Regions:
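NAD(P)+-binding Rossmann beta1-loop-alpha1 motif at the extreme N-terminus of oxidoreductases
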Residues: 1-42, 199
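Generic secondary-structure signature for well-ordered alpha-helical cores
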Residues: 21-24, 55, 112, 158-163
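Active-site-lining helix/loop region of Rossmann-like oxidoreductase modules
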Residues: 138-206
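Short beta->alpha connector loops
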Residues: 61-64, 122-124, 146-147
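Rossmann-fold NAD(P)-binding glycine/threonine-rich loop
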Residues: 78, 86-133
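Rossmann-like NAD(P)-binding element
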Residues: 34-35, 40, 46-81, 86-91
Length: 206
């Protein structure tokens, strides 16, 4: 599958390496692609990356994601599955940019013809692509209004090492708020543990 990843930071690079290892055709999208040729991964401009992609991944800072996607244009994104892994936070990481909503909802509202699925934002880049390295099974969440888009996303999560038994569909795109709002607790837990390589495991009573 042709996967375009918007962004060239740790998350975008980790996901690109993970999906490339699983046999997918990956391309990173940058506003300044000529300055990002040292990544060991193919890099192109944002519009070229969007045109390349069967699946587009938003791995840009949540504060700029919607404007960046608007620069590509709704016609170029129409009908393309967009997996959103971003979270909007203040510069000091103490406040959410969308406290009464979510980045995923903002993207879906701005691009109604683009199915959006939220996932992978409750963990760091290392954990996203190496769940088997954790001390036990954990949970990855999916939010979105389009059932087929979530099924495709689930298959791509499986390719990163997340079995179906670890994937939990928590509802429509409004449920992305729960995923994104975990970011503040994630920061607190990371400070307490002295490590960012952890994630959530949903457990139930027998």
């Amino acid at each position: 599958m042709r996967i375009g990843l918007l962004g060239t930071g740790n998350v975008a690079r980790a996901l690109a390496h993970g999906w490339s290892a699983a046999g997918h055709d990956v391309l990173l999208g940058s506003r300044k692609p000529d300055e990002r040729k040292d990544l060991g991964l193919p890099v192109a401009g944002l519009n070229e990356t969007a045109a390349h992609a069967e699946v587009l991944v938003n791995a840009t800072p949540g504060n700029v994601s919607v404007d960046l996607l608007r620069s590509i244009g709704a016609p170029a994104l129409a009908g393309t599955l967009l997996i959103d892994v971003g979270v909007g936070l203040s510069d000091d990481f103490t406040e959410l940019s969308h406290p009464n909503s979510s980045l995923a909802e903002q993207i879906q509202t701005a691009f109604p013809d683009t199915p959006v699925v939220k996932t992978l934002c409750t963990m760091d880049a290392t954990t996203m692509v190496a769940p088997a390295a954790l001390t036990g099974p954990s949970t990855v969440f999916l939010s979105g209004d389009d059932a087929e888009a979530k099924r495709t996303t689930g298959r791509l999560l499986t390719d990163l090492g997340w079995p179906e038994s670890s994937q939990l569909d928590i509802g429509g795109i409004t449920s992305a708020r729960g995923q994104e709002h975990f970011a503040l607790l994630f920061i607190g837990i990371a400070n307490g543990l002295g490590s960012h390589t952890f994630t959530i495991k949903v457990v139930t009573l027998p």
